[in-house]
Amino acid sequence: NPIPQLSPDFGAPSRIEVNVSNTSTPVITYYDRRRQEGTMLFTDQGIEWKGEVKDHAFIIEESADRSMATMVISAPGVRERKPEFIGFSKSPDRGIDVQAGDKIEIRVARIDCKAADVPTFLSRFMAERKLHTVAETPRDLMPMSEVLARMVRNIDERYYVGDQWQYYCPENADWMSYGWIGGLMNTYPMLALGDATHLEKVCHTFDFGLGHGAGASGYFYDVVGKDGKVIFRDGAREIHDIALTRKNADILYWMVKQMMLLKRQGKGDKIAPEWEARVKQLADAFVATWKKEGTWGNYVNAETGSVAVFNTTGGAMAVGGLALAASYYNHPRYMEVARAAAKAYYDNFALVGFTSGGCGDILQNADSETAIALTTSMMTLYETTQDAKYLTQAAHL
């Protein structure tokens, strides 16, 4: 397999190894669901050796018959192979020469606790994690006003003006890459500035972005070129009709949010009926897929609306998008599906303890982006329904 994981194939070698320098918190945790008990093993960054700190490595390995799992905290960390962006390369790690009388000290703080479920265990971890690492103070390198000024400049510098269309580019290329912290999302802060110049640029971007790139189902393809034609890249090079679920979920949430912002700014007359119709078609596509499949998967077929690749939390942002769309379009069925999807996503998180599927370039690995997307969606549901359970679930995430 091209990513670090325990093997899904019974009997195959099954091992994960990672150096502490690649972790946000130096800890191995495990949860016994039957006993409702959890254990956390916190370590230092590594060992002190001849004036240097040598990273620990964390290793988890399953036996061939899967009857036992071994967890190792090694000193120093020497991985068998080094994980790359996708795949592995030869490990650069080296051991140390130990002489008679040398001492290696490994400090491990073990925390055992009762936990009724995975979210409870993770909440305990969040309470403990800073207690076992060296305290760090914030590094205030520049005032927030300067950060905002630089970000506005960065987005403005990517505004493309062509013979036919003009729009904000989310990447360093003259194409529209939808969603994924980019296309039809980077327009929100520009719209919030409130001036006429940025409003005009945002409107041009909506005209181009919403006027192109949609399949027959209402879902959008991942990328559209400056000629208005779909660009098939990544997995779509092999299977043309697929589109990343996460990108479409981002479009839905942020487009409804931006149309709401325009109305709050007293600029509702700037909202083109074509925008509203296209965004509603996208909301309808999410509803139709959910009714048919009971999930939005990792990828959808932009033409048929069927799930092309299953599993993951890739559609997390669509929960919030449908919740907003229910209010914007006065369409209760959107809220019905938003609630159903929120329950399915949260129940899966509560079972496995992570979310995944937001990043098209890391397969179905766990990621932080779906975690914050689902958190945002839960908060949106709380704000739109006042149901306190969504606030609690957002806190768990």
PLM features per residue range, with description:
Residues R150-E171, R246-D250, K291-Y299, E336-G358:
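Extended glycan-interaction surfaces of carbohydrate-active proteins
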Residues G315-V352, D367-L397:
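Active-site neighborhood of glycoside hydrolase catalytic domains
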Residues R233-I239, M260-P332, A395-L397:
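Active-site lining segments of carbohydrate-active enzymes
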Residues N1-A277, Q281-D284:
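Carbohydrate-recognition beta-sandwich/jelly-roll modules
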Residues A214-G215, K263, V287, K291-K292, ...:
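Helix-capping and short linker residues that terminate individual alpha-solenoid repeat units
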Residues G211, G218-Y219, D241-R246, W254, ...:
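Extended ligand-binding clefts on enzyme/binding-domain cores
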Residues L193, V202-L210, A216, Q258, ...:
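Alpha-helical solenoid scaffolds that mediate protein-protein interactions
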